[in-house]
Amino acid sequence: MEEFQGYLELDKSRQHDFLYPLIFQEYIYALAHDHGLNRSILLENVCYDNKSSSLIVKRLIXRMYQQNHLIISVNDSNQNPFLGHNKNLYSQMISEGFAVIVEIPFSLRSVSSLEGKEIXQSHNLXSIHSIFPFLEDKFLHLNYVSDILIPHPIHLEILVQTLRYWVKDASSLHLFLFFFYEYYXWNSLIXPXKSISXFSXXXXXXXXXXXXXXXXXXXXXXXFFRNQSSYLRSTSSGALLERIYFYGKIKHLVEVFVNDFQAILWLFKDPFMHYVRYQGKSILASKGTPLLMNKWKYYLVNFWQCHFYVWSQPGRIYINQLSNHSFDFLGYLSSVGLNPSVVRSQMLENSFIIDNAIKKFDIIVPIIPLIGSLAKAKFCNVLGHPISKPARADSSDSDIIDRFVRICRNLSHYHSGSSKKKSLYRIKYILRLSCARTLARKHKSTVRAFLKRLGSGLLEEFLTEEEQVLSLIFPKASSTSRRLYRGRIWYFDIISINDLANHE
């Protein structure tokens, strides 16, 4: 986002922070294309992997400059000369580029919100893995947890109203509405419906950016609820219809309760409430009682109904004890267990046996859903037996090996924080043997004969960077390297959840 910020600062006097001119910049489409490749590294069909080029981008921008081609109706889109034979390609490129542009206000606002605050290495907070050290630190002291799915679909008009609070550029808002109203029948943009599924995997990037705006607004309101939880018991849900009046009413209520009801505020205060969200799933945890958790649950349900006009069933939001419940979040299965230990104490002639139980935050990889994701991607069957990939048999040997190795390292990198690495060893075995079966099928040979001819080279390709570094540092002390590799490792360069790990 530094490139975007630099562009806005250079043209601030001329463009007044307008986002609309960015749609005519070539580097926007290059960045959108790179982001698309990074997101779809595990997918078989990349949207325009081999079709997008600087020549096509220049042709697209030139046609947008020459005529007012952005005013196109759906009925004549097949005959429109601007789209021509590249209708789906152009629409995909425009929507992907516009999705990158829509993300600019959120990025700049998040950076500005961190300025002036003493947050060490705030750029690391962008990593998904930064959530898990927070969970390890906080959840050991909490009692109850609730898995919450943010309800959807949200109507398009509600998304646009939410987006107005973030994007002040009227031209960009009109362009956003144009995409969803004029091109709603194009599969490359969104599904043909007036209300979109905010967290559907088939939604386009522009729809996902708008849905992220709605989820960010919900998360901001949840943080506001957390800070003002003492006073919300008397707040009417009707005040949530307009946030300006809502803030005004809350401010008035604060003055009233501070002056008149100071003695009873502690009954409703919950200083140990924690909220974590990624995409459409959130985790709410508390050290308080089930009564307080139920109060929060109904606050959120009423908020969704009154502010986003979406229906959520309170009975489907479960409150569980952390001590006997595991929750699935971001491709990991997390739980708080007890690690028993026995201490023998000697005092004069008497000895005592003391049983201690220390809480431990355990994070493992759910192997069954992950194998299901691999089976859906045709790397194995539903039982976890590796199979060949006939769709990749036309590629060269180096391309086939490189693709399997990248997928394996990607999964190992993402799941490096697992307490138990045996599940990862099984995933590596599936991918390695699936790669061998694919190569053997291409060369019309058996797997045994192909592996014998290839030797240990294929195994070395599937080693992760961590294993390679540890083998260099401890070439002879294999037990030491294995012990270090079994430890949890969190990385600060993971900005999106792995596609195969996203089995929620």
Curated annotation (Swiss-Prot):
GO terms for biological process: mRNA processing; RNA splicing; tRNA processing. GO terms for molecular function: RNA binding. Coiled coil: none annotated. InterPro entries: Domain_X, Maturase_MatK, Maturase_MatK_N. One of its GO terms (cellular component) is chloroplast. It is found in: Plastid, Chloroplast. Keywords: Chloroplast, mRNA processing, Plastid, RNA-binding, tRNA processing. Its main location: plastid. The keyword Chloroplast applies. Usually encoded in the trnK tRNA gene intron. Probably assists in splicing its own and other chloroplast group II introns. PANTHER family: MATURASE K. Belongs to the intron maturase 2 family. MatK subfamily. This is Maturase K.
